[in-house]
Regions:
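Extended polysaccharide-engagement surfaces of secreted carbohydrate-active enzymes
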Residues: 3-341
Length: 341
């Protein structure tokens, strides 16, 4: 649930939209609680928790400085003692973990963490409540997360990202809406369960596969549709997770109503402030369209967000902000993609 001291965003529900409650903030709260609970752990529990806790504290350089309140004095002292304890080796082990009761999968390695958030007949597409996370309609639509040295999801990522183009998702980019405000004065709508049960996965040791059937048909509430989306959209997505490779597959993706085309989003990453990240396609650095729009303009579809079209794409690579970046391989010879900044 934590990577380098940050709580995973796929586990945060609607709180991802709170700019003052980032994954770093929640991660620090979790670390503080972990320090408090150390005395209640048995020997086996301490052997498991101490190495991970030590690495989280080492990776979050601002954790100790954030402990400023009177009630944090003891926590800070214990954290310092843990850092100086040479008998504890900082280590977060590789793991492949399925969470079937919330349709999540986490694939953790030393230098990265990959996660997928899905939805089904059991789990909703997102959490929208009390006017929070109003545009989070596709956050569980097979969204893929890559955590590495770039800290992608901090610094108000969720309130600035294109809500129709979240990494790994296959969607019809339409404004689903949030319904009318209730007696509280806040909107509560836009989240729903699908009618699909083929959602889940399995694993062998530290490797695994997951799959998700999806469609625009949603479950009804009190006999009425929860939301008007794209009833003709359907398909299946699968993810095969190995050591350094993640294989992402899509099959049977169709939508009879093509007024607004279906989009599959390969990646959507936050760049450096100057946008200087190198992007390569088949070994060349092409010119790519620069698009500017705020989230409200994106939701209204009032701005042209089409990208530069590339054909016969075999591979691509995007340089990271701090990391070496991520490579993408396309096995089919006729692959065509669109790219914009």
């Amino acid at each position: 649930a934590i990577y380098k001291g940050c709580m995973l965003d796929c586990l945060k529900g609607r709180s991802v939209s709170r700019p003052t409650w980032s994954n770093r903030d929640i991660g620090r709260e979790a670390m503080k609680i972990s320090v408090r609970l150390l005395d209640f752990l048995g020997e086996n529990g301490r052997k498991t928790v101490l190495p991970m806790l030590k690495e989280w504290i080492e990776e979050d350089k601002g954790f100790l400085d954030s402990l400023k309140n009177v009630e944090d004095i003891d926590i800070k002292d214990r954290a310092k003692k843990l850092l100086s304890d040479t008998s504890v080796r900082s280590e977060v082990p590789s793991v492949h973990k399925l969470y079937p009761l919330m349709d999540r999968v986490i694939h953790r390695r030393k230098k990265y963490l990959f996660a997928v958030s899905m939805y089904s007949e059991r789990i909703q597409n997102t959490e929208i409540m009390n006017h929070e996370n109003r545009f989070g309609w596709h956050q569980n639509n097979g969204m893929t997360y890559i955590y590495d040295a770039d800290n992608q999801y901090t610094e108000n990522y969720w309130n600035t990202v294109n809500p129709f183009r979240l990494s790994g998702t296959t969607v019809v980019p339409v404004n689903i809406g949030n319904g009318k405000p209730d007696s509280s004065g806040y909107v509560q709508g836009g989240d729903f369960c699908s009618k699909e049960s083929w959602v889940g996965g399995t694993g062998i040791e530290n490797f695994g596969i997951s799959g998700m059937a999806f469609s625009g048909k949603v479950q009804t509430v009190s006999g009425d549709p929860a939301v008007s989306y794209a009833p003709d959209l359907k398909g299946k997505k699968s993810w095969f997770m190995f050591e350094k490779e993640i294989v992402c597959l899509g099959a049977g993706i169709t939508n009879k109503n093509m007024e607004i085309p279906v989009e599959t989003i390969i990646e959507n990453k936050k760049l450096r402030k100057d946008g200087s990240n190198q992007f390569l396609i088949n070994g060349e650095s092409p010119d790519v369209l620069l698009r500017k729009a705020d989230v409200k303009e994106l939701v209204k579809r009032s701005k042209d967000m089409s990208g530069t079209r590339f054909e016969q794409v075999h591979w691509a690579h995007l340089e990271g902000n701090r990391s070496v970046g991520t490579g993408y391989y396309f096995p089919e010879e006729n692959t065509e993609i669109q790219v914009c900044r």
